């Protein structure tokens, strides 16, 4: 929130450090071209923009269901957590402040009452894991996706870390049996 941002800024000044949010989309060649075209008036005046951020099911289950952003208390709204760069791009593109913004969604599907019959609390012990589109075993072990977030200590292999995470860690939990709110 705003008060927390002021505290971060004060701490940075006290430590002689700089804190900045980098909105890198402004500097991508494709977006620069879009900005040039819009600014030229070639397409007329922009009246409204509809923008969709497709987070994707793998990222959703990794970050917002099993992961560190799985509770409202430990997270920011999706617009801030995932879309601040998009919002910056749109305001930069249009040279205007936003008048109205809508965001739709919620944490309504990954709940115990929606769990498949026979599901277990951990994917590696689940009888429906092979057919589950949200399988942690498939995501991390078979496809090796999102494993760059796993810390691999000296003397351990990534395979050992994935196995331990699947058997004991947050990322091995069934999406329907997590503590996300």
Regions found by a protein language model. Give the residues of each.
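Glycine-enriched catalytic-core subsegment of oxygenase/oxidase enzymes
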Residues: 177-181
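Predominantly a Rossmann-like dinucleotide-binding segment in NAD(P)-dependent oxidoreductases
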Residues: 17-18, 25-171
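Beta-strand-loop-alpha-helix segment that lines the small-molecule cofactor/substrate pocket
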Residues: 1-26, 41
